[in-house]
Amino acid sequence: MTDLEYVEHCLHIPDPQERYARFRDDPRLRAILPEVYALDGVPQPPAYHPEGDVLAHTLLAVFHLPGGCGRRLAWAALLHDVGKALTTREVAGRIRSFGHDRKGADLARAALERLGMEEAPVEDVVWLIASHMFALSWQIENLDRISRRQWRLIADPRFPILLDLAEVDALAAGGNPKKMAQVELYRKARLRLDIGV
């Protein structure tokens, strides 16, 4: 089994607790994915991340993956915050990780190419990671306030996977009701596009 196959096997362990424990404890995974385990001890703002450091958040994202999810979502959940290891700073007494989405996309590309993943899924995972902060930046309360630019993102064929990533990300941070409501609003927006209303 190649390293890529091994990680994918672990990402698709049906029991979420077993999957979580594997990623927490397996030395082979630590050797294969130094980008992920560099997140150990990287702080996050407790008000938004009561679960702890970035590695704890990442392991919970892996835990919350829905059964039978596709490889793009699984890899995006695993790698979505790897950029925080390089971007996290204290700014004016607050923990910030400006640009972690873009830096994380670059790190994810390098890791996935190193592991030998095909180009198309690499591009999709990179796009998901680069785009995963959209929900935080939009803060839209009703569909009539969505801009043309935002509708273009919603129309992207990968957007439903991005919504699944946003949900997994929110669940890994304690399932904040406001974040979950945002995900549902964006699902309604996508449905509106899909049915042409």
Write out the residue ranges for each language-model feature:
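Residues that form generic nucleotide/phosphate-binding pockets
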Residues: 9-10, 22-26, 35, 64, ...
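Divalent metal-dependent catalytic cores for phosphoryl transfer on phosphate-bearing substrates
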Residues: 63-175
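Exposed alpha-helical structural elements
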Residues: 5-6, 18-22, 28-31, 35, ...
